[in-house]
Amino acid sequence: MTSVLIVVLNWNGIKDTEKCLDSLVHQTYRDFKILVVDNGSIDDSLERLRKIEKKYDKISLAINKHNKGFSGGANTGIKYALKRGFDAVTLFNNDAEADENWLAELVKGLKEPNTSIVTGLLLHEDGKTIDSTGDYYSTWGMPFPRNRGDNTDKAPESGFVFSGSGGASLYKTALFKEIGLFDESFFAYYEDVDVSFRTQLAGHKIYFTNKAIAYHKQGATSKKIPGFTVYQTFKNIPLLYTKNVPAGLLLPIGVRLFLLYVLIFANAVKKGSGVPAFKGWLASIRYFWTKSLWLRFSIQSNRKVSTSYINSIILHDLSPDQTGMRKFRKIFTGKA
């Protein structure tokens, strides 16, 4: 059997984490352990997590002294899995709950050819609509969730996708030995797409299974910090582009991304979020010169697939919510 470490991050969210863990310990697939990574909580999380650790043999606790974000917390769990010889590691949001067959279905997905990441059907907590079926990366330089907001009965068939959702996906541990861990510059948001992009460039595939079902209370952690999502978005979108887009696609995607970036920046200013947006942009410039540009050289020099292949698996369209960009789309595609 495939041995799996399920990694759950907690940051001042113990009530959600307790519900999450209750759903995980009752999985029908039994060759797993759970590692709860506490990301510097200042509430009563640690006290309650230590009690849970004593109650369940399958649960262990790792403590980060400060909040290292999703990417840093995930890396704590991945390093733990690598050190102890697990075959796979699953990242699961603490504000989510899993169907009892969720893990079993993810493991089955590893049987698909050349698959190193398996992602499932993540629903909103009421189960009526879809949160994610993986992620797209578009020719406009913007990643976004597949099928978000669609009715659950419209969930797509299982098959290969561009990116898995970091909140409920399974990764072969051997993959991280090859492509490296999560990039902690991202901290949170789009770090999962970055790993998936690097996975695709390295010649591995990512599989979506609609039978691995989980339920997500979207944004329960990020809502605690005003401006957090805006800052991370404006910082991370350029990093994702700089590191991963092949040279032959830099110009066509870059022109579109510039237009889209300006539009969403103007929208952020209009909504009173101009300061975190501007700070995010400045941070992206700093990371470009100090880290992402140098990482690009390594990633692209080790690329095992063609530019045409990457072009074939990205989405040649805008995300559904980018209504303001439709007027520009006609310039590039000839359609409104």
PLM regions and their residue ranges:
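Short, acidic, metal-binding catalytic loop of nucleotide-sugar glycosyltransferases
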Residues: D22-D31
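A conserved acidic beta->alpha catalytic loop
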Residues: S23, D38-E47, H66, A96
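Short beta-strand-to-loop acidic/aromatic patch adjacent to the donor-nucleotide binding site
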Residues: F86-E97
